[in-house]
């Protein structure tokens, strides 16, 4: 690529472009350091934390996360007090703006408090149900960590690298479990029910898939906007390792989150290099599938989790080799075009066309579901029936839970419709009222709605669900609007969005939801940091918007600490 700084309109810029053309970042404060410690605890230590048993893993995660947030609060308060005592005017002058995201977070928590006050099961609404433990206590921890991180977490370019290497041990354990091995002895200590459905140090494979979804979103976002060889290889490895983990989880909800990633990323592709990096993602996914095929074959064909769905297709389908070759060819072709014409920028019209096509496809699918579910409910659909006909069997019997949850919500009084019956009390909707029906359906017991949004609707009401959806929408919107200035904002916004999409088919719990709220808070913090940098007055004339809207050529780690390379 031609040197941007050599263009005629920018020849007046200072020679030392890394240190003089941009405002010097403010010095690190004690609050910033404390936030770094909490981020490391939440993204590296927490996913690995366990007590060696799947039966009580949720409690172990709760026992780690709650003290971590309380410690974060205490240390942040002490650090802030010391700063106020030393530089009172400087600290008080830097008041953080109150955003829509903040308002939605408070609304979400306030609804949980009100629902607890009026709940028929106040103790359960406070602590959460057995194994889930997702009551008012952990919602309070999410709220505290959100406000602390969004105010004090800055210079976050190191986060994707730490997240990448921190997740690798989790994925390695997941791979070993998938191959029928038990290196930590979890299965020997856990009951048979959990042995069948749990993997790694995360627990249920659906929870594991939600963790992988967030990881892949961060890696893909960083890969898409990478400009140099080293970060491209690094985040490419991250996508490859995450793809292997996703296959090991063998959860449809995880692939739904990945599908959301594929349809959103094209809106951020601006040139041939980024298109090449986009094509690299499915290429790495198919490559991971074939690598898993050989690993399973080397293991004698033994897998703990039966091969099914997309995992089976990626591993065993001959077409996977064809797709791998096609995607690899696209990558090479686009890189050659970028080498020939590095200054080419794709027109906005292409993104508009993609948006129209996406909206049309979404509408067509919804129309098909409505038609085959309500108008022509007897038409034979074959294998498509489990996708296009919404009934009790839809979505691995999730339809049963959704229909009953909405039926119960319709019978709520006004107060319950607004604030629900108490956080994590959904099991009282199903047990014992629908126990017999659940046994007839497939010997499956539902203690939750298997949909995060409906779960919040019936437990903390329409007010709580509105706060939750509004929080996600606000953070994602703010992140995407700033994606042109920071690839980290794009990556974190994608992580929030992918978790939100897979949450349609998953549940909130203490194994991965704390990681989600941490990434959500970091996305908000990243947006605030970008806004603060925009308000700062540079010592030299500011640089015009660069191609790819990235910072000057510098490594992510050195950028994180504001040092020139």
How would you describe each model-predicted region?
Residues 2-14, 18-50, 68-80, 106-118, ...:
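Alpha-helical transmembrane segments of multi-pass inner-membrane proteins
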Residues 49-64:
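Short, hydrophobic transmembrane alpha-helix segments
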Residues 61-62, 126-135:
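Non-cytosolic membrane-interface motifs at loop->transmembrane helix junctions
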Residues 84-86, 336-343, 528-539:
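Membrane-interface capping segments at transmembrane-helix boundaries
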Residues 132, 173-188, 366-425:
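Aromatic-rich transmembrane-lumenal/periplasmic boundary elements in polytopic membrane proteins
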Residues 549-565:
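Long, low-complexity, intrinsically disordered segments
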